[in-house]
Amino acid sequence: MWYDPSSNVVVYNSPDPLALAAALPEARQLTNGYVGVPASLPNLATLANLGLTIPRVMDHRYDWPIHPSKRPLAHQKTMANFMATHPRSWNLSDMGTMKTLSALWAADYVMSQYPRGTCRCLIVAPLSTLQR
């Protein structure tokens, strides 16, 4: 699998390209068993449900905050990528791992991929976290 950020397409070398193309109507068969799939969030969720490795699209297509105190750590980027590509996911990490920021970044990315007002998100956090 490789990801082309310029065209936002994921390319898989599939042993059964017809099955992958049948599961994803937007998939296009390329040469020698390769299949190109547009890296939209619904397609990525389907690929993940099929057990395929999916790219970390937020690393390429999201403008992470540049303020030094809000710069995401590696584990926060991993969690935000996971939550953005796995609908209805939960982040039950330990206290102090900055779950709320990861969830906010994931929600911001997901909402930017859909028409305004068509995507909703619920983030549950203690009041003390929101006051900081």
Q: Where are the language model's segments positioned?
A:
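Charged, low-complexity intrinsically disordered regions
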Residues: M1-R56
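Conserved Walker A/P-loop ATP-binding site and its immediately adjacent core
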Residues: T100-W105, G117-R132
